[in-house]
Design a protein with these regions (language model features):
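Beta/alpha (TIM)-barrel catalytic core signal, keyed to glycine-rich beta->alpha loops juxtaposed to Asp/Glu
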Residues: 3-192
Length: 192
């Protein structure tokens, strides 16, 4: 069971506070309804928030956003590296989201819905096989990562699975992604 959408400290406080989602998840685990409890979150604060979450509770898994563009940001990278250290110390699983996120949808402003776009995602995903292959290869080349969540549109699933089977070296993946002038953090504008 993953506590979802815990991407900042206010959300973490709600989830881990009295009467929060964590209490229900732990109860479900104690009753044998779930084997493990993890945490997931979106946004540029997610790695720092998930580090704090691991200080509060021994989550079995952490699912945090990671891709090449996100790790280019020095602050994000530092938070991510500290999270990786703690995940290793606690022997938790580290999974990623946003591996194939290309950028925000063009013409969708902060707080606006992304409905009507080509895919059922709130960000624009890569949708060309070679770009997906590069993005998946780049993420999975990091040994701390135990898995990735696919983009939220089933039409991309086959390309993501194929990308995993046909991975390219990290250097080639990085070069392929760097050639996309529109590659950007999907967290520049968050949807409603």
């Amino acid at each position: 069971l993953q506590l979802h959408a815990v991407g900042d400290l206010a959300e973490l406080d709600r989830a881990t506070g009295s009467g929060g989602a964590l209490e229900a998840a732990v109860r479900a685990q104690q009753e044998g309804l779930v084997a493990a409890v993890g945490i997931t979150g979106h946004g540029s604060q997610a790695p720092a928030t998930h580090l704090e979450a691991l200080r509060r509770f021994p989550f079995a898994t952490v699912m945090t956003p990671v891709n090449q563009k996100l790790l280019e940001d020095e602050g994000f990278r530092g938070d991510y590296e500290r999270l990786v250290e703690e995940v290793r110390r606690q022997d938790a699983g580290l999974m990623t989201i946003k591996a194939v996120a290309r950028r925000n949808w063009p013409h969708v402003g902060a707080g606006e819905s992304a409905s009507g776009q080509a895919y059922a995602t709130w960000y624009e995903p890569y949708d060309e096989q070679e770009r997906i292959r590069a993005a998946v290869s780049w993420v999975l080349a990091h040994p701390e990562i135990t898995g990735l969540a696919t983009a939220g549109d089933v039409r991309l699933l086959g390309m993501i699975v194929r990308a995993e089977r046909e991975r390219m070296p990290l250097e080639d993946a990085a070069t392929a992604l760097q050639t996309d002038a529109d590659y950007a953090s999907p967290f520049l504008r968050m949807p409603a």
